[in-house]
Each structure stands twice: as structure tokens, then as C-alpha cells.
């Protein structure tokens, strides 16, 4: 899948963001991560080709049990659905 990478000095965790380009909460999560200098990768699912969209849906369903955006996965084990600042801070140690 074509993820985009945002560099940051806070790179102790692998952070993956599944988002939609038009989603306000998705934009807030990306900005929160940038503001805290967190390195992360993201994909705007709505901008992908149909085959990629299907793979994203399968991956989200298997990892989070839902198809909600935004979904953040930290270190392939912590799943945060929605913009939950306190959960993000705890998972990232910031």
C-alpha cells in the first residue's frame, strides 16, 4: 500500500495512520503527530485505487474490528480508533 512518511525526532514507535483526505478528525490526528514531532506513516484511503481500498478495508477490519477513520496503529499492537489525544499520548509516551 502507498503510505506517505512524515519524519519526526520522536521515532521510538512505529505509527501508522489510516485516514480519509476529507476527514476533519484525520487531519487533526496528523497535525497532532506533527506538532509533537512524531514520525509516522499515513494513507488517505479515499485517494487510493479500488484494489488498494479493498486491501485497506481488510487490514483495518482484521486489526481494529471496524472500518472507522481515523485509525492509528502503534507498534502493530495498539489500535486507537478516532482522535483520542490522551490515548495517543499514552501509547507514544508523550
Model regions and ranges:
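Local sequence-structure signature of Cys/Sec-based thiol-disulfide redox active-site neighborhoods
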Residues: 2-41
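Short alpha-helical
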Residues: 24-25, 51, 86-87
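Structural signal for short hydrophobic segments within the conserved structured cores
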Residues: 41-43, 78-80
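Thioredoxin-like thiol-disulfide oxidoreductase module
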Residues: 45-66, 93-94
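A short, hydrophobic beta-strand/beta-hairpin element that forms part of a small beta-sheet core
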Residues: 70-79
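Thiol-/selenol-based redox modules, centered on thioredoxin-like
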Residues: 86-94
